[in-house]
Every structure is written in C-alpha cells, then in structure tokens.
Amino acid sequence: MDWLAKYWWILVLVFLVGVLINVIKDLKRVDHKKFLANKPELPPHRDFNDKWDDDDDWPKKDQPKK
C-alpha cells in the first residue's frame, strides 16, 4: 500500500484519460448536421428591462442639432 500513497496521481491520470476517450467516442457518434436540421425553435427572450426600452436617451439620427 506504500506504492498507492506514492503513486495515487497515476491512477487519477489513468481515470481522466479514460473519461476523455469515452467523451471523444461519444462525440463522434453525434450527427451535428441532423441536429441542426431538426433544431427546436427557441422561445423569445424576455428581459425585465423592457420598461426602459421606450425612454431611450440616445439621440435620434433624424433630429437636428440644437
């Protein structure tokens, strides 16, 4: 068990390499073209700043300068 105390990080690296290999294999199975063709429509975004959208303090382009 002394070797486990010294070389525990090697087991962690082997585990992480295994996870990365499985992620890569799973991502290769994803058909992104099929997903993009059947992509669901997103609902419109609603923010809570809409009450300030009307009273915008940016100058209008059509207004003459004072």
Swiss-Prot record:
InterPro entries, A to Z: UPF0370
Region named Disordered: 39-66
Record's keyword terms, sorted: Cell membrane, Membrane, Transmembrane, Transmembrane helix
Pfam family, one: UPF0370
Transmembrane portions of the chain: 4-24
Chief location category: membrane
A single cellular component GO annotation: plasma membrane
Topological type in the membrane: Single-pass membrane protein
Biased composition regions of type Basic and acidic residues, renumbered to the chain: 42-51
Lineage top rank: taxon: Bacteria
Subcellular location: Cell membrane
NCBIfam families (alphabetical): PRK13664.1
Record-stated family: Belongs to the UPF0370 family.
Protein name: UPF0370 protein CKO_00315
Organism: Citrobacter koseri (strain ATCC BAA-895 / CDC 4225-83 / SGSC4696)
